Amino acid sequence: PLPFGQRIDRDAPVTAQFDGRDLPAFDGDTVASAIVASGQWVVSRSFKYHRPRGPLTFAGHDVNTMVQTPDAPNRLADELPVRDFPITTAQNVSGTLMADRNAIIDWFGRFLPVGFYYKAFFRPLGIWSFWERLIRWAAGLGVANLSITPRYTDKQYLFSDVVVIGGGPAGMSAALAAAEGGARVLLVDEQPCLGGSLTYHRFAIDTTERDQLAHELMAAVQAHKHIRVLSNALCNGWYTDHYLPVIQGNRLFKVRAKSCIVATGTSEQHVVFRNNDVPGVILCSALDRLIYHYGVAPAGGLVVLAGNDQAWLSALTADDAGMAVAAIVDLRRAPDETALSEEAARRGITVHCSATVYTADRDPKTQSLRAVSVRAVTEQGQVGDVIATLDCRVMAMSAGYMPAYQLACQAGAQ
């Protein structure tokens, strides 16, 4: 029930297929959310060693979700609506996704370092031409459909006083401030609806203030006559004299503005440990999106690895959604907010402070997470003995945030 599953319509079921397997889903689901909802975490295989890969961000910020559609390869499954892409397949596999014959390459990984093929296969003289053909055959991910008819595309010119990139709380506030000053504002957001982090991020134990702020800002933006909103739109450049190409569907908007405001938010950072690429290991923000946007609460137990208080809040969200939270493992001695540890204790959630996940264990049958090994942090950069081995199917982690500054950097900002 709401507030979980904001983007799906449970009265509009959709039948999709991934790799020949039926996926029950709802209108509003993405291919990735439907796959995870079906109980499977593996979506793709890594390029070189063919290790199993699963979603990490559920925001289109990682390549783990690349799949093949009938018309194009390398499409991000966490950005593909199942309504528009009912048939998708895995790519870069020999055999099936779950039984990839090329996964044997991973067994010899220690003998295949980065760039080894630039230093080998050159003797005896003339042998390189033979190896080059094999390497080129093995390269690549998906398959290009050369018989596909190119889709219709068009362009439109837009002029605005102020363009705001990003429809989160900062972007909506900036758009409202500019519009109240009399400016014509164009608000561009890559998500299907406004709100940004307000639609999934938990800022406090009590979510009332967040929900109220989200409702007020979105209502004010939609009602303002001087603000035009482009949702599901990507601004992929910022050029001289505030020329901004914005792509929405099959249309390219060539936007000119007097000024531009970038409010693109942040990207969550992962934690480094052994086997942190195992499917089922995700970011805390990805878990929040999965629950709030698509109403998916994966079964099998959850471990949260915390480097900040936000991870604790994600654990509370998962508990609210009915997930079995096995433990919170905090790299610090304690959370900054004592109310969080008190709330976790009240809910009966096990907590390991001054500890870290040292390694993740992969289930050979499901090719996804089975358990994590927890060790005590003894000093800076040092760990002690194993203090717990926790069975889980999902591990969410958060180690801080980095500004999504790519657009500003492309424009020359430093």
Regions found by a protein language model. Name each.
Residues 1-414:
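Residues forming the flavin
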